[in-house]
Amino acid sequence: MQKNITNVSDTEQQLEIILTAEEYQPEYDQQLEEARRSIKIKGFRQGHVPVGMLKKMIGPSLEAEVAEKMASKHFSAIADEEKINPASRAQIDSFNFGDGELTIKISYEIHPEFELKDLSAYSFTQAEYSVTDEDVEREIKLILKGHGTMVTIEEAAGEGDTLIGDVTKLDADGNAVENGKNENHHFNLEYLPADNPFRMALEGRKAGDSVEVNVEPKEEGGEAIRYRVDVKEVKRLELPELDDELVKEITQQRFENVTDFKADVKLQLQAHFTDKSEQDLLEAMSAKLIEEHPVPTPKAMVASFQNMLLENAKRQMGGQFPKSLNEAEFLETLKPNAEKHARWLLVSQKIAKENELNVTDEDIKAYAEKEAEKEPSLTVEQLVSTYMSTEFKDYIIDTILKEKIYDVIKSKVTITKEATPIPEHQG
């Protein structure tokens, strides 16, 4: 057997395999004999069709089958011998039987060769969140809003109130536009931006007030649109008093007093923002290393990530896209993001290889012990059994390996902790 490897690009190779008749003939004869036994031709007993006739009938398909078998048999051995790292399935480009030889040309993609940058040259800032009593009170207020009651008020609307009114579109002369009325529209001032024209016009208004609102055009040269809002009602969310009885109701008896409830809210907030800090750091590190390693990405790898992103988007839309969406065009818009995913996979695999990272059964057990602390209803033994199952093992190995890769990165880069306040949010 002869073999010739040609580099087509940084991520593509072509392998030429040349086999002598002595090497491929046994396979050819076997395929021919199997065909002879199974093919039925009128006028001949099954298994007794003349070889010459059989070759004329199925010669091309027989040769294709033999070429496929020979390519499959020899490619993996050559890949091991030549240290080829395929990134896609090998495809037969061509084959030729002639002069006592079988020549097969196979194309495939490979992982590109590249050098990792010195990780110690990179610095990152990690947010260090500390939950204050004020943060806890804000979070509890959000929880109480879910148990509040909307009540009608006579006073002027404040920033957290809701106004209900009829909205009428006006023409340039201030007259109502035909079919331009929207009755009982709700304006929740809390969720309107501070510079929203409706919010600016309606704050401080009471039931019975009428106010005109001018909405400036989004595009230069456009005309402003005028509206009149006739306020019919102002509502305010009245929050219940936080006491032990409400705590029992909110937590379904998990906590029996306000003190314990507040302590748990603080604990949950701290856990959430500690996790957010870690995830933000990991994302910043991977984004930087993707940027610093502009390695070429195999097409098959990119296509795989494109399809993954497409399916994720489809799931978020309830399992199918709107009919108006051109799926092929949308798939193409996902390509830049897919290339980043592929590049990160190449970089992370390189880090794992250079640091000889692997996942052992002991690693899986340690991971199960850590997860069991988060979920007291499950024992370590139950989790180990699940993680070692055929269905979950590959996923768990991948998860643990990712952790090890990030641990290597964190051990080499410089990380500066920065005290950061908990961001305020509305609800």
From Swiss-Prot:
4Fe-4S found in the keyword field: no
Top-level taxon of origin: Bacteria
CC terms in the record's Gene Ontology section: cytoplasm
EC number: 5.2.1.8
Keywords for this protein: Cell cycle, Cell division, Chaperone, Cytoplasm, Isomerase, Rotamase
Reaction(s) this enzyme catalyzes, per UniProt: [protein]-peptidylproline (omega=180) = [protein]-peptidylproline (omega=0)
Localization (cell): Cytoplasm
Signal peptide as annotated in the record: none
Cytoplasm keyword on record: yes
Pfam name, any one: Trigger_N
Main location: cytoplasm
Biological process terms in GO annotation: 'de novo' cotranslational protein folding; cell division; chaperone-mediated protein folding; protein transport; protein unfolding
Gene Ontology MF annotations: peptidyl-prolyl cis-trans isomerase activity; protein folding chaperone; ribosome binding
Database matches in HAMAP family: Trigger_factor_Tig
Known role: Involved in protein export. Acts as a chaperone by maintaining the newly synthesized protein in an open conformation. Functions as a peptidyl-prolyl cis-trans isomerase.
Family: Belongs to the FKBP-type PPIase family. Tig subfamily.
NCBIfam families noted in UniProt: tig
PANTHER family assigned to the protein according to its UniProt record, in alphabetical order: TRIGGER FACTOR CHAPERONE AND PEPTIDYL-PROLYL CIS/TRANS ISOMERASE (PTHR30560), TRIGGER FACTOR-LIKE PROTEIN TIG, CHLOROPLASTIC (PTHR30560:SF3)
Name of the protein: Trigger factor
Organism of origin: Chlorobaculum parvum (strain DSM 263 / NCIMB 8327) (Chlorobium vibrioforme subsp. thiosulfatophilum)
